[in-house]
């Protein structure tokens, strides 16, 4: 799309923006416009347009591009300590890497200063955790995604099965509903991403997480062993090929009635009610995952440490884009991270999975705030898959994963 052409959604967003964008102190025109770089997709087109509307015309420059190009440009610019970029769109994993490199402006003081004005306490703790590194906030949350618990409401009612609140109740329900062509639960264990997400849930809901406060692995301790042992037992009720099942495969299994329940992303909920894709429209419902601790992911906008523009002005600009009224409209494009928006009755009528999304946000957990976590995940998931497929005993597999994780983190300076 050219810079002069707009999608219908962009036009709608632009028309709505002036109705609720609070006035923000103009940037210093002599210093040039605030430069924002961002990934291109409908939701981000909308939110970057809100940034442009937050300041007088010409005070904000927005450049939209593919995510790989945007991250590359931000990396090159910030690593050279250039002030050529003021604001960059970053997902939570990339934000961790940039914050660890010292390229981002900590936002804690600005957050406290403008907390009341922009109702920043409307973001749940799980979202704040996902935009923080070493206890400091580095990004304004814009888009969020959470895993939720999908279930066939008709099967639960017909069998008199109570909705699970704990992982043991989840196991019992999966065992009970595992009949005929219907598997008890989906399990998304394709490496690395699928298995890492599923393991994250088990290790938080049953175990004590991944690391202690000094980044020493604890997933091989008794609670972690119990978590992965239950995960192994649960595979008896999963569809065939669960070790190669990614999100697409698990989504299809739910849509086609080949599984009674399981963990999947918020972004997959709408397809359950799509008559062209789902055979069970209106029969699938959602709750927060049993035990909580499932993965949430959050994307936002961070301020470059090297920006020469007024940081108060920049912060107010991105806070305007992330305001309650802005996200009320933005909910048309993507899940908003504000609880007040997810509570909106009108939105709940339009998107019946929103109440479960809100409940899931409150109990979810982001990946550990470690810039090297995906490398850790590649190690650990390899051994978890060996454990759940009986190639190794669970304890032995997790011990080996912990040893290799410790060696990796030691080589990267995590331990004194």
Ranges and model annotations:
Residues 2-101, 112-118, 163, 243, ...:
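Conserved N-terminal structural module of periplasmic/extracytoplasmic solute-binding proteins
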Residues 21, 133-142, 147, 171-217, ...:
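Extracytoplasmic/periplasmic solute-binding protein
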Residues 65-74, 167-171, 242-255:
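Short helix-initiation/N-cap motifs at beta->coil->alpha
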Residues 86-89, 260-265:
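Paired acidic/hydrophobic, glycine-rich loop segments that form the ligand-binding mouth/hinge
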Residues 93-146, 171, 198, 281-285:
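Hinge/lid segment of periplasmic solute-binding proteins
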Residues 108-122, 189-190, 206-226, 274-279, ...:
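Short, solvent-exposed loop/beta-turn-alpha elements that line the ligand-binding surface or hinge
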Residues 174-177, 214-243:
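Glycine-centered hinge/linker elements that transmit conformational signals in sensory
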Residues 267-280, 290-382, 414-416:
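C-terminal lobe and pocket-closing loops
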């Amino acid at each position: 799309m050219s810079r002069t052409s707009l999608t219908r959604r962009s036009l709608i967003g632009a028309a709505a923006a002036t109705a609720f964008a609070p006035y923000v102190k103009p940037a210093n025109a002599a210093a040039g416009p605030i430069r924002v770089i961002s990934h291109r997709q409908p939701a981000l087109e909308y939110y970057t347009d809100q940034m442009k509307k937050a300041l007088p015309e010409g005070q904000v420059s927005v450049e939209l591009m593919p995510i790989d190009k945007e991250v590359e440009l931000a990396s090159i610019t910030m690593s050279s300590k250039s002030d050529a970029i003021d604001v960059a769109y970053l997902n939570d994993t990339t934000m961790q890497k940039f914050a660890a490199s010292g390229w981002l402006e900590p936002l804690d003081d600005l957050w406290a200063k403008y907390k009341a004005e922009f109702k920043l306490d409307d973001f749940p703790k799980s979202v704040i955790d996902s935009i923080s590194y070493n206890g400091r906030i580095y990004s304004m949350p814009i888009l969020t995604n959470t895993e939720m618990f999908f279930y066939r409401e008709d099967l639960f009612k017909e069998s008199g099965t109570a909705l699970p609140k704990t992982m043991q109740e989840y196991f019992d329900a999966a065992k009970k509903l595992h009949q005929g062509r219907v598997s008890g639960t989906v399990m998304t264990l394709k490496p690395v991403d699928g298995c890492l997400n599923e393991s994250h849930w088990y290790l938080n809901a049953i175990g004590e997480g991944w690391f202690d406060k000094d980044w020493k692995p604890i997933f091989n301790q008794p609670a972690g062993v119990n978590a992965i042992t239950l995960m192994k037992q649960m595979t008896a009720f999963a569809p065939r090929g669960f070790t190669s099942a990614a999100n697409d495969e698990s989504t299809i299994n739910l849509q086609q009635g080949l599984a009674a329940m399981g963990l999947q992303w918020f972004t997959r909920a709408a397809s359950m009610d799509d008559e062209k894709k789902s055979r069970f429209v209106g029969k699938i419902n959602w709750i927060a995952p049993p035990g909580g601790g499932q993965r949430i992911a959050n994307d936002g906008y961070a301020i470059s440490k090297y920006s020469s523009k007024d940081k108060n002005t920049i912060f107010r600009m991105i806070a305007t884009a992330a305001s309650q009224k802005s996200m009320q409209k933005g909910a048309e494009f993507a899940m908003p991270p504000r609880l007040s928006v997810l509570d909106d009755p009108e939105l709940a009528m339009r998107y019946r999975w929103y109440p479960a999304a809100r409940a899931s946000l409150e109990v979810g957990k982001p990946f550990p705030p470690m810039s090297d976590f995906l490398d850790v995940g590649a190690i650990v998931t390899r051994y978890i898959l060996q454990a759940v497929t009986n190639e190794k005993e669970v304890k032995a597999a997790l011990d080996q994963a912990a040893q290799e994780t410790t060696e990796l983190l030691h080589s990267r300076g995590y331990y004194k």
